[in-house]
Amino acid sequence: MPHNPLIFQKSQKYFSRDELARLPVYRNGPEAEAGWDNLVEQVRALMESGTPPEHEKARELAIRWMTMLVFDTNGDPRLAAKLNHMHENEPSLQAHIGISLALRDYVLRAFSETKMLIYEKYLSPGEIRFMRANYGKRAMEWPQLMADVRDAIDEGITPDSPQGAELARRWLDLFRSYAGDDPGTQLKFRKALENEPDLMIGTWADEALLTFVRQAMSRVVQLN
């Protein structure tokens, strides 16, 4: 049970008892809560000082933030998606914990920058411009999609099933939103993912999830 009564109250609305038992952030003690409070204050200070999210310090804090968030959601994108939903829909909680939507978006932009800097090593100037114009626009859709893939895996749904194909199409749609439709460009992004383990830091995309998606997408491509 969290030490904070408001967090306890709000969590009951969005999570089942089983989910709360699997949610480390719900069981955080004073030391972990203090760690979050300190990180939030550092990020807020940067944002309020006008430091752009692309700045090195902002990127460092964003990586810490997302790494802690993955840990505190037990690496489960379903818990992350619900936590996002709770945060977005509870203004009193935002105010209480000091994480406004603007602060969250600042972190997401800084975190996106850490990934784009890696991808840039593989892309042409034109591809970089397209990626930078579109990369963060649909970032908040990824946790729910990964949650749906995780549900499919746990339910025994196979990648070559109709449900697997639908998940693959949704994944491809999000991927193309920043990679574009050129197969050559898409191959560059996939090459980066193969070569750059840092692209997976602070995400909920484990190997089982990625294997399912790769197999499902391969099946969709064959059918087309």
Where in this protein do the model-derived segments appear?
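Amphipathic alpha-helical "stalk" segments
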Residues: 1-224
